[in-house]
């Protein structure tokens, strides 16, 4: 288990010391940096830091033990860092801010290799991309300086553990709720299966799950191969547009805001060609055996038009998990990027009800449709 050192947090837009009574409804952004001894294969044993963002109402920021069961940690997926995925600076599209305004203390963590967390040095060399992805970054295709696994699912679980323990100590709570997206499903779900005593509730949008995954899937690594990838604006738009299945599903202005925040989260990638987002190639995943022992109350949401994590795969996860409290939501007019689309508030409100009451539309166990003509529940 990695060792953590808790550091001084930085607060924006106002200093905690200057808070006054009339500031209590102001929403704060607080940056935390958690020092760890890394277990990431590329930098194992070296000091590293994890970026943890906090959104909280100013009135609760100084009361370290006032939140009780209202402490949440967001965990991102394979490509987009947490502060972009869950706290995008566009209208009311920040999932973190939505929950914070409802009285939660809301945190997110960037895994090693993402956002403002430590990025292993090989990520700074475009030669470590696949040769067909190097164009525009180097004059001619080049051999990799590093062709091995950067991170692993096991090191991701250690990153989640470091963040969970940091938040538990900061807020004096035994358990936190986890909210994740996409490949954050294996990260958060796998962690919850291993540490149920530290997880109160689990919510995952588009949880990546493979019922046929090998029993040793959690131990799989890249070996020799391409350690990282990039995403350009063209890639980003094309992937989203192929998942549009209804009129006005998302706003171009929202897409622009997401991409602006994406480049801001990766200052080095922003200088490569027209600007790209860099990420490690994710290796390993959770296993069906882990899912079958997962007893934490679990809300899973699937966008009706998701072409990255097919809704049927999420239904398989619903069937496989052990929890007696589980809800599957089929979200209308939504893609893999549902939190940035027109039905985002349906998603956010469902998550709030799950966190506060353990139900969605009053349902504790079952399958629901949201955003269609009317919500319907089936067992």
Positions of the model-derived regions?
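N-terminal cap/lid segment of alpha/beta-hydrolase-fold proteins
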Residues: 22-67
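Conserved acidic catalytic loop of the alpha/beta-hydrolase fold
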Residues: 134-147, 157-175
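Short glycine-enriched nucleophile-adjacent loop
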Residues: 185-196, 202
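Active-site nucleophile loop of the alpha/beta-hydrolase fold
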Residues: 203-212
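Alpha/beta-hydrolase
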Residues: 212-301, 379
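Conserved alpha/beta-hydrolase "acid-adjacent" motif
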Residues: 307-313
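Catalytic histidine-centered segment of alpha/beta-hydrolase-like enzymes
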Residues: 334-345
